[in-house]
Amino acid sequence: MKFLILNAGSSSQKSCLYELTGDRLPETIPEPLWEAFIDWTVLANQGRLTVETAGQKQVIILETGDRQQGIARMLDTLVTGDDAVLKSLAEIDLVGHRVVHGGTDHAEATLITPEVQQAIADLIPLAPAHNPAHLEGIEAISALLVLGEVPQIAVFDTAFHRTIPTPAAEYPIPQAWTNLGIRRYGFHGTSHKYCAQKTAEILGKPLADLKLITCHIGNGASLTAIKNGVSIDTTMGFTPLEGLMMGARSGSIDPAILLFLQETQGLTPAEINTTLNKKSGLLGVSGLSADLRTILQAKAEGNEQAQLAYVMYIHRFRSCLGQMIASLEGLDTLVFTAGVGENAATVRADVCQAFEFLGLKLDPELNNRSPRDTVISHSDSLVTVLIVHTEEDWAIAQDCWHWWHSQGQRKQS
């Protein structure tokens, strides 16, 4: 079976092709036959496509800013050129999509029907940076005649957080508002779930025995408290804007600020939304960049706003982590993942320093090496700290495999 995975971001498209054989999933993560990444931010009205097969890498400039055309060109590299891995796109058995927001109706991998596609569209106001990109991928696949009848499966970021108890999931607002679907949905669920399971595997312990917090820290960032193997609290909420200070997102702020800006500055909801999601966080405070590496470099050069941005970033990270520890009523395992979480030793050290009173003790040498899928806490630490490399694409492929074996084969017969 060949599964194509599309993982769309607000300004990128990451894709890979897995070949899975037999009646069981492999014990180790297989190397994809093909990987591709489109970056829409590098060139104006163009995209930069990077394709890798069997260790060979090629870069293609897409002479279009049209996402569907770009995805079609990306898929063309599967079957054309010296590094083609398929004779025809018809060899693809299933296409899996990461979808950020699934609302209250989707708790597992779901066959994308017109009704599901419309539901994803209806949730665009709650995930304006992501759900449109997911729809572009779905529509691009549907537009290809050779793939038009191939099952497309949605794997929702929100699904893992369906287990959050009502007191943590609902907001202290009138019930009439709650009845509108206003609640904590949580995001990065595919990553949090994968990293939790991988942590249990690394430690050789049942996941249900761990009081675990997973820290998915990239340009977007969230923490999740996991107890008895399920999510019981998370920092993102109704939208991916709540919680931690992020690269360009503000994270949690006093909602009265928005009313103040509307009343005194005449800002529209759209203007406020854009500012909070794309012009705040590290970028907004520093005035320089949403990239933590740039902030750290500027901080080292004495830039005061970069220094302030970093200190705020760490302060809010610590505060949110304390909140998750309280929800767990303790902590025995802490996991860092994603771009910043896996690579920024300084962030890990500065965050963990505040929790030494819990007996948490990093091993400085291990932490500075940023090893993958490894414990980085000291041997006498009361809290085990790990770096786990998140594998969202493989996690999506696993969910698609389970769907295929539980439902897909019946639908094909």
From Swiss-Prot:
The active site is at D157 (proton donor/acceptor). Keywords: ATP-binding, Cytoplasm, Kinase, Magnesium, Metal-binding, Nucleotide-binding, Transferase. It holds the Pfam family Acetate_kinase. Pathway: Metabolic intermediate biosynthesis; acetyl-CoA biosynthesis; acetyl-CoA from acetate: step 1/2. Its EC number is 2.7.2.1. One of its GO terms (molecular function) is acetate kinase activity. GO terms for biological process: acetate metabolic process; acetyl-CoA biosynthetic process. The keyword Acyltransferase does not apply. It catalyses: acetate + ATP = acetyl phosphate + ADP. Mg(2+). Can also accept Mn(2+). GO terms for cellular component: cytoplasm. Transmembrane segments: none annotated. InterPro entries: Ac/propionate_kinase, Aliphatic_acid_kin_short-chain, Aliphatic_acid_kinase_CS, ATPase_NBD. It is found in: Cytoplasm. SUPFAM superfamilies: Actin-like ATPase domain. Homodimer. NCBIfam families: ackA. This is Acetate kinase. It comes from Synechocystis sp. (strain ATCC 27184 / PCC 6803 / Kazusa). The lineage of its organism: Bacteria, Bacillati, Cyanobacteriota, Cyanophyceae, Synechococcales.
